[in-house]
Amino acid sequence: MPKLQTNGAKQKRTTYMILLLWAAVCFALLVVDWCCWAPNRLDADMASEQLLANLLAQEGGVMSTNWYYSTELRVLNTQLVMAPLFRLFTSWHTVRVVGSVVLILLYLAAWFWFGRSAKLKYSGLLGAGLLVLPYGALYRQYVLEGLYYIPHIAISFVVLGCAVRILRGGRRLAPAAGMVLFSFAAALGGPRQLFILNIPLTVAAALLCWLDAPPADTLRQKLANAWRTPGGALLVPTLAADAAALAGYLVNAKVLAEKYHFQDQGYVAFTGLNLDRLQWFANALLASFGWQEGKVFSLAALFNLAAAALILFCFVFSVWLVRGKARYPLGHRLVGAFFLAGAVCFALLYGLTNSGHSDRYLLPLAILFVPLLEIMLADCTPRHRPDAYGLTALLAAILLLRAGTDYRAAAVATNPNQGAAQFLVQNGYRDGYASFWDGNVMTELTDGTLNVWTLTPNSVPELRPWLQVTSHLQTPPQGKIFFVISKWEAYGERQPTTQALADAMPEDALIYEDETVKIYGFASDEAMRQACGFAAFP
């Protein structure tokens, strides 16, 4: 018997070291990407977050009245990490790399909190590697490089971990307080977290209570039975978290909206059933799981097969979890119910309202494949364990291959704004105009040297109150200025055409041209407006 125990302990140590190596390799590859290749794929949204963090570092606050935010206010968000780093480093790239490391470590800490709460094998080391692996273009752009969704997903892991601990019994006050506090803080930024976390979690808890309740002759008795089930212990904390989230959103809409500049979500209204938007939801779900366009006879087919398998696994296994009262721990069943409730919530939101939508909005739902996969490995029977381990290893290998192709593409990519930004700095330009898609990128690439007034697509230089300092709409650029016309933008490939704006530029003012942009130089803002026939600065 001692020998068998020794062999078992040795096998566990070996497995632990393999999983630790897996997570370390995945993390190391991501750090190499940040250090060496991230500037190659820097985009306007990523750069805008850095501009905000730099502004907050100068002002010494966590929010700013001198910034035009986008769809939500940044409260419990990435600027809490990035802004202090600007007081330590002058290189914006260094700030981005160090800040990314810190944020990913916080992301993993939230995951391990959930893993320990749910008693996953090795606290979820396999999942830790998957979380830092770019399994799809959207996840790479908006989580691992852009970092935007790290707060949303990390908060979900923390609150889910608290919920699982409540269902395990023992101390319940501290986890319940954590659910309430994180729900309130997250909702201060806007209503997004309610749809990502609070509403699905409440529905999931209620669903499990209903399914686990003994049969009854009346609805009232059934509800009473549901309340007395083991899952009933979670109902009060989830409802309290809902109340806290609503209170946070109320502060956002009624108090913070009066002081800060961000898009109001009050426009969202119910509509009739929109089949086109439901079709979009299905396609967005595919994309958020890593589906990509490409030739059938290529690696894209393998990656898309993995994405489809993950979607099928998440839905089927979640149903098994919800229905498996006798087989699965209640906390694990909660995760399955949470995934199903989240999918239904998003489908209803986009199918029955006019809410704004983007493929990336489903990333917090798609990433639940990681805890579901870990739960499957933790709960599978000895009979099915070899098959489960083998299929998981195959999936991990495919996703690692997918990540390798992504990193290879990043290594050979070039940022189209790099040459233009260097030219402007070398020739003494500091202030000027560009589209949103170019301007903030140029600022980050030059460590804040270029100060760019970003424009909305129009036939005249109309400033856009979106992800730039408010002073840009009050005062014009100073000294000699530049005006960037992106060729792809002039051709209307991403935004409504600005060909009229391009046509207004006098050719004798052209100072730089490459395959992506034309740049025009003027002695002053007033000189530019006179030469182009534009009205005076507002």
Residue ranges and their predicted role:
Residues 35-44, 57-83, 93-94:
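Membrane-proximal lumenal/periplasmic loop motifs of glycosylation machinery
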Residues 427-462:
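Short periplasmic/luminal acceptor-recognition loop of GT-C membrane glycosyltransferases, typified by
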Residues 174-200, 243:
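Membrane-interface alpha helices of multi-pass inner-membrane proteins
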Residues 61-63, 80-102, 107, 119:
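Juxtamembrane segments of multi-pass membrane glycosylation machinery
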Residues 98-122, 158-161, 313-317:
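Transmembrane-helix motifs of polytopic, lipid-linked glycan transferases
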Residues 71, 75, 120-167, 189, ...:
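Membrane-interface micro-motifs in multi-pass membrane enzymes
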